[in-house]
């Protein structure tokens, strides 16, 4: 069996990450390693579950502080995020591209106009680890350019190592995991309130159609 220098470098780096599982800068070390193989412009490690996403680590904004657009995402725009919707409707582990989850009319959605085109810009991929209790651990990588097939192939190749490290890291994220997730903002309540003002209560199916429309689904997809 022969190994290339790149193989040796990868395995050495993964070994160093195993040693750093309990380190405060674990997530930064992980994304810096991935950047050596695939370029990207933004990243965040978070947990999708009931309630608002819980953030473990994120890349800083342009001024080095918290990204205000990402704070808007956490306050409610995440409900329209195709990755979030997919994690709630069809939770599973794997490597997912934007093209795998985005609706037909994605570029016409509020989410795209108010967040994605400004903060992520062109493309996004997620490495997801499905957990118990309807929770999904996610490492999201955003790019101002489309990820190439070669880059996606590299990420697919290293995903098992990355996913294993992510799962093991959870044992050291007690501070975030033990803090109660904030409840979801009431998009459903907002729709119901509008319907009440019109004097026409909405059925469960009408509420679901409203959510799908806000998420950018076409009439065919609905």
Model regions: which residues?
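Hydrophobic helical signal-relay modules used by sensory signaling proteins
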Residues: 13-17, 154, 179-190, 205
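Helix-turn-helix DNA-binding segment
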Residues: 185-222
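Short alpha-helical interdomain "coupling" segment at the junction between an upstream regulatory sensor module
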Residues: 166-186, 193
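Short, hydrophobic secondary-structure boundary micro-motifs
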Residues: 96-98, 174-175, 222
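Regulatory input/activation interfaces that engage signals or partners
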Residues: 2-150, 154-160
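Signal-transmission/dimerization alpha-helices at domain junctions
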Residues: 154-175, 219
């Amino acid at each position: 069996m022969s190994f290339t220098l790149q193989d040796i470098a990868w395995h050495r780096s993964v070994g160093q990450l195993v040693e750093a599982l309990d380190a405060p800068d674990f997530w930064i070390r992980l994304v810096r390693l991935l950047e050596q193989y695939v370029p990207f412009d933004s990243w965040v490690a978070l947990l999708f579950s009931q309630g608002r996403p819980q953030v473990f680590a994120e890349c800083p904004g342009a001024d080095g502080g918290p990204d205000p657009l990402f704070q808007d995402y956490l306050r409610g725009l995440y409900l329209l995020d195709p990755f979030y919707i997919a994690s709630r409707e069809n939770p599973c582990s794997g490597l997912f591209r934007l093209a795998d989850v985005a609706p037909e009319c994605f570029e016409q959605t509020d989410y795209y106009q108010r967040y994605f085109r400004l903060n992520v810009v062109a493309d996004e991929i997620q490495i997801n680890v499905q957990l118990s209790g309807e929770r999904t651990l996610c490492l999201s990588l955003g790019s101002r350019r489309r990820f190439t097939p070669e880059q996606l192939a590299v990420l697919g190749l290293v995903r098992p190592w990355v996913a294993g490290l992510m799962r093991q890291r959870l044992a050291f994220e007690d501070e975030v995991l033990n803090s109660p997730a904030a409840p979801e903002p009431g998009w459903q309540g907002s729709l119901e309130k509008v319907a009440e003002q019109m004097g026409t209560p909405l059925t469960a199916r009408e509420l679901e159609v409203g959510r799908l429309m806000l998420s950018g689904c076409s009439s065919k997809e609905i």
